[in-house]
Amino acid sequence: MVFILKGATLALHFYLYQFKLFNISEILPIWVLWILTFVMIDFVFYFYHRISHRVNFLWAIHMSHHSSEEMNFAVSFRQAWFGPVSKIPFFMTLPLLGFDPTIIAVAGVISTLWGIVGHTQIIGNLGPLEWIFNTPSHHRVHHGANPQYIDKNYGNLFIIWDRIFGTFEPEDEPVKFGLVRNVNTFNPTKITFMGWIDIFNNIKGSKNFNEALYYFFGPPKTKN
């Protein structure tokens, strides 16, 4: 299913590329275009990721990735079932701006591989690289349930967006991995839908339409 969605997304990007606003490939040297594509993918990812933590229905999709109380490479594959779909509206902006869909796809795979490496406790501080890149240390913070670590370090490849937009937090104390309210189950179906069940239960008990909208689009009531 993931590969089908990836293929459909690539096809959509090629379609949208016909309506690009800027002919970037004719303006920039190819090596600059590649670098800029990596930067823009991470820029879009930062906001997609940040919104996924602050909008309730997107958090219901994303929270399964944070449900593990361990931190290792396997956690990077603990992905939300509907995650690839939720990303589409955000990343479709890139081909519309004029970024080549083929370069987007390749750079996206490389960025994903970097993200996989970030899910580990084996790699410590990487010195000067900590200022620019989202290192394993920074990503451990992102998976922390410690109060000061919640909703921090959203970047995938770079940490510069977090530094710019005020969501950066260094790894100063041991990280307690998982959710504030842990799921206490290994059942993938329960983990995937428990956030949705909470949303619909809250909507069912809402007093008016505005309150129902808040439960769906507002921030998570309890930061799970």
Predicted features along the sequence, with ranges:
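Alpha-helical structural motif
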Residues: 8, 31, 109, 153, ...
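Cytosolic-facing loops and C-terminal tails of multi-pass membrane proteins
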Residues: 174-224
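Juxtamembrane/interfacial segments at transmembrane-helix boundaries in multi-pass membrane proteins
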Residues: 8-32
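Membrane-embedded catalytic scaffold of the fatty acid hydroxylase/desaturase
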Residues: 1-5, 28-180
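Generic secondary-structure transition motif, activating predominantly at the C-termini of alpha-helices
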Residues: 16, 20, 137, 165, ...
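Generic structural signal of hydrophobic/aromatic residues within well-ordered alpha-helices
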Residues: 12, 129, 161, 196-200, ...
